[in-house]
Structures are given as structure tokens and as C-alpha cells.
């Protein structure tokens, strides 16, 4: 739990790069980018790892990136959803426990969990494990009606909302996540994509 939220709170925001259908079949990798910021203003650094498309290593790679980084004053982990590189689902409870930090998941469109479960059951032998991780992420809360949703682990909903607002700059998406998305898509496709 965070006692006091400062405007310059140290946050790491993770997003993944683009990938093709062909890379899903071949089980290729895509880049995972973490952008470290002080609030919404100053970029402090960037960490990267490679994760398997539709794999099971996103959680491990995020933990590794945080533990092996020089950024020891991080206070919050932000995720742009919990599925990376297709259906490489993050175990947010493990991520929070192993890093000893709260996790805030920010989502632009409210996920259709039933459709996700159906797709997982149809295409993955480990579907039940992935579905379990989707449910472990907690209740989906609406911050801006129809436009922005979030989930929070290890931090109150009020604090999560305050942190989301503190880290927004020129978009509804918090700046660490917006920049992670731009960097990851530029690495994979040669040019940054719209958020």
C-alpha cells in the first residue's frame, strides 16, 4: 500500500510490440518495453525484454526487467492490459508479490471476457490456466465512462485513480504506457503506431 502519492512518483509502464499472424504460428517473439517515468513529465529510462507470442513468459520477463534494472526507486507498475504478445497473460498477483509493488492495469476498451475465454478454449491447451489469470486480475472499474477502465492490485481504487490521473499528459492513456507503446511498435515495425 502506498502511504502518500507524490506528483513525481516513479512508475514503470509496460507494453508490447506488434507481431504478425505468421509469428503466432512460428511462436516467434516480440519486444516488451518498460518506460520508467517520474509522474507524467520526466522519462528516467527504458528497459526491454523479448517475450514469446502466445507464450507464458510475460510475467517472468517483467519481474526480471525490474529486478535487473538500475531503477530501485520504482513505486508502481502499470500495464496496458494483461495480455501481451497475443495471449501471453500476465499473472498480476505474482508480478505484484515478486516486485513488492502495486500493479495498475489500464484498458481503453472494456474486455469481453466471455469472448476471450472462448478463444482461449478453442486455441490453447493451457486455456484454463490463462483464463484463471484473467480472473485473478481483479474487478474491472470504469474511470472515464466508455473510454477508460482499470484494475488494481495492491493499491486502493482511489489511489489507483489518482495515480492514473497523475501520469496522464496528452492522452487518456498514462504517459509511461503511451511511450512504451510507441517505442515497442517502432522497434517491431520501423515506425511508432497510434495508441
Swiss-Prot record:
Xref: Gene3D superfamilies: archaeoglobus fulgidus dsm 4304 superfamily
Top-level taxonomic group: Archaea
Regions that span the bilayer: none
InterPro entries: Endo_dU
PANTHER family on file: UPF0215 PROTEIN MJ1150
Family to which the UniProt record says this protein belongs: Belongs to the UPF0215 family.
HAMAP family, A to Z: UPF0215
Protein's name in the database: UPF0215 protein TSIB_1161
The species this protein was found in: Thermococcus sibiricus (strain DSM 12597 / MM 739)
Lineage: Archaea, Methanobacteriati, Methanobacteriota, Thermococci, Thermococcales
Amino acid at each position: 500500500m502506498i502511504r502518500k502519492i507524490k506528483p513525481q512518483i516513479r512508475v514503470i509502464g509496460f507494453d508490447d510490440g506488434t507481431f504478425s499472424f505468421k509469428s503466432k504460428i512460428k511462436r516467434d517473439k516480440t519486444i516488451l518495453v518498460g518506460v520508467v517515468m517520474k509522474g507524467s513529465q520526466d522519462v528516467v529510462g527504458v528497459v526491454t525484454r523479448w517475450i514469446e507470442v502466445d507464450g507464458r513468459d510475460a510475467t517472468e520477463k517483467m519481474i526480471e526487467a525490474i529486478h535487473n534494472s538500475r531503477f530501485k526507486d520504482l513505486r508502481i507498475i502499470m500495464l496496458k492490459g494483461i495480455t501481451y504478445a497475443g495471449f501471453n497473460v500476465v499473472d498480476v498477483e505474482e508480478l505484484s508479490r515478486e516486485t513488492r509493488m502495486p500493479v495498475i492495469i489500464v484498458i481503453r476498451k472494456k474486455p469481453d471476457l466471455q469472448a476471450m475465454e472462448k478463444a482461449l478454449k478453442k486455441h490453447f491447451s493451457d486455456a484454463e490456466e490463462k483464463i484463471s489469470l484473467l480472473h485473478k486480475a481483479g474487478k474491472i472499474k470504469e474511470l472515464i465512462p466508455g473510454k477508460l477502465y482499470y484494475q488494481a492490485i495492491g493499491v486502493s481504487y482511489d489511489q489507483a485513480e489518482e495515480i492514473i490521473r497523475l501520469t496522464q499528459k496528452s492522452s487518456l492513456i498514462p504517459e509511461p504506457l503511451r511511450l512504451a507503446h510507441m517505442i515497442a511498435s517502432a522497434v517491431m515495425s520501423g515506425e511508432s503506431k497510434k495508441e
